[in-house]
Amino acid sequence: MTDLTLFYGTMESGKTTKLLQDNYNYRKHGHKVLIIKPLIDLKGGNTVVNRTNEFAPVDILLANDESIFDDKYLPLIKGTEVILVDEAQFLTEKQIIEFWMLAHKIGITVICYALKSDFKGRLFKGTQALIGFADRKNELTVNCKCGETAVFNARMVNGSFVFDG
């Protein structure tokens, strides 16, 4: 049985690095992998890129008003065994349900990588839907500069923490 899996964490917790490693491992074993990210995510253009500048090309840039089941994406999905979704916090609940359907009705392994919350501690809508629909949830952690496990994203302007915006 295939699952919808979520890897989530704060900024710099290694979410995209995990995606890139998963991509490498699945492809090494001969699996057909599709990489997707929301169109709204401008970092890296049509690639997923981590903080050490490792990258992989994106197969689908998915707009918020699009469905993964749109006719233009069906040929790409056909024969796919694994879908990796970067920056999944920007997806809509409808899109999360579609990825759940791909896993449970079509038999494609779907793995999403997402920020848990914004700098105010509020869950992103895509992450909230994933927490509800994902079969497996895995937190990735990173140490804060204070040495403890980071639990929030910080927002800084000109070197100072800000709490508005």
What residue ranges belong to the model's regions?
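Hydrophobic transmembrane alpha-helix bundles
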Residues: Y73-L76, E81, V151-N153
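Conserved P-loop
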Residues: M1-L74, D118-A129, E139-V142
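Residue-level signature of catalytic and energy-coupling elements of molecular machines
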Residues: L19, D86, A134
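Residue-level preference for the first positions of well-ordered beta-strands
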Residues: L4-L6, K32-L34, E81-L84, T109-I111
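Short glycine/proline-enriched coil/turn segments at helix->beta-strand junctions
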Residues: H29-H31, K78-G79, A134-D135
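Conserved P-loop NTPase "ATPase switch" module shared by AAA+ and STAND
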Residues: I77-L91
